[in-house]
Amino acid sequence: MKILRKNHPLLKIINHSFIDLPTPSNISSWWNFGSLLGVCLMIQILTGLFLAMHYTSDTTTAFSSVAHICRDVNYGWLIRYLHANGASMFFICLFIHVGRGIYYGSYVLSETWNIGIILFLTTMATAFVGYVLPWGQMSFWGATVITNLLSAIPYIGNTLVEWIWGGFSVDKATLTRFFAFHFILPFIITAFALVHLLFLHETGSNNPSGLNSDSDKIPFHPYYTIKDLLGIFLLLLALMILALFFPDVLGDPDNFTPANPLNTPAHIKPEWYFLFAYAILRSIPNKLGGVLALILSILILAAFPLLNTSKQHGLIFRPVTQAIYWTFIANLLVLTWIGGQPVEYPFTTIGQXASITYFTIIIILMPVSNIIENNIIKL
């Protein structure tokens, strides 16, 4: 068996990726989230496949088909809630994974980092089109508001919006194509995830100390397979608690009402994992400016390798940048809270301040703290 896994063309790839992979001996549980994202993706594809067998992407029957899945299909309610809450677990793991990458300086592996940003954007697109499919009130109005933002693009904006809608409003054509996108995108994510892994294994993993660990590597199996299995069991436990005890806690009550183009909900808002970006969008009074800020809130992650001037890898021995980093995390939580609040004083003012802080920390404070710490080292 040992000879086979080392020589067989297919098994050799698996062996070099998950069994004999040289791994730093000191990576902590923060490195578990990559494998947890892989598990989340598999759960989403499997549950999504079973949901797609019973779902109909037609405006007259979409809402009823989701109700039918929950009421009449064997364990349909469980599959539906695992899929809906699985998306939330996916984004929790994704945010922690990106946060760990920033904290420990993983962005210096630029190819892996940039493919990670593409994965992040693709996952957000998948979640957005998926949220439209149940065809509830918030699904319909969320789709209308977010797709309508494209009309801010000069010259081609209105044409682009109508092209995406497949008509002059969000209707049957929109739902059908969103279902098609939602079905195909997870497989594109899987392909990108493999490329992400390929580039990671070209350079090897980073580690908490930020030091070169070539002299102290251990095989991935059994040490980290066991560690990953523990993480997977904890993830599944959290997902089952969420899906069985609090299935609707992260959803929106408006989505229990079928979509009605003649009745606008009091507060249109996306799912919780988009609220930070939505708050940044809303904090700018100009439509085009808001859209640009929304896009930049994610794409600014690509600036981390460019803005990094530190002589040290990661933040483990850098107290000044650590303080700024945790301020950044707190600011993100404030943005998430503001995104779910109505557009009125004082929430708009808090949102504007938090949005300015978000970009200031990344573009100004972190690079300045790098320079300060580099000078402290020389003392």
Swiss-Prot record:
Heme b b566 binds at residues 97, 196. The chain crosses the membrane at residues 33-53, 77-98, 113-133, 178-198, 226-246, 288-308, 320-340, 347-367. One of its GO terms (biological process) is mitochondrial electron transport, ubiquinol to cytochrome c. It is a multi-pass membrane protein. Heme b b562 binds at residues 83, 182. GO terms for molecular function: metal ion binding; ubiquinol-cytochrome-c reductase activity. It is found in: Mitochondrion inner membrane. Coiled coil: none annotated. Keywords: Electron transport, Heme, Iron, Membrane, Metal-binding, Mitochondrion, Mitochondrion inner membrane, Respiratory chain, Transmembrane, Transmembrane helix, Transport, Ubiquinone. InterPro entries: Cyt_b/b6_C, Cyt_b/b6_C_sf, Cyt_b/b6_N, Cytb/b6-like_sf, Cytochrome_b, Cytochrome_b_C_euk/bac, Cytochrome_b_N_euk/bac, Di-haem_cyt_TM. Its main location: mitochondrion. Binds 2 heme b groups non-covalently. Gene3D superfamilies: Cytochrome Bc1 Complex, Chain C. One of its GO terms (cellular component) is respiratory chain complex III. A ubiquinone binds at residue 201. Its cofactor is heme b. Heme 1 (or BL or b562) is low-potential and absorbs at about 562 nm, and heme 2 (or BH or b566) is high-potential and absorbs at about 566 nm. Belongs to the cytochrome b family. Component of the ubiquinol-cytochrome c reductase complex (complex III or cytochrome b-c1 complex) that is part of the mitochondrial respiratory chain. The b-c1 complex mediates electron transfer from ubiquinol to cytochrome c. Contributes to the generation of a proton gradient across the mitochondrial membrane that is then used for ATP synthesis. The cytochrome bc1 complex contains 11 subunits: 3 respiratory subunits (MT-CYB, CYC1 and UQCRFS1), 2 core proteins (UQCRC1 and UQCRC2) and 6 low-molecular weight proteins (UQCRH/QCR6, UQCRB/QCR7, UQCRQ/QCR8, UQCR10/QCR9, UQCR11/QCR10 and a cleavage product of UQCRFS1). This cytochrome bc1 complex then forms a dimer. PANTHER family: CYTOCHROME B (PTHR19271:SF16). This is Cytochrome b. It comes from Akodon orophilus. The lineage of its organism: Eukaryota, Metazoa, Chordata, Craniata, Vertebrata. The gene is MT-CYB.
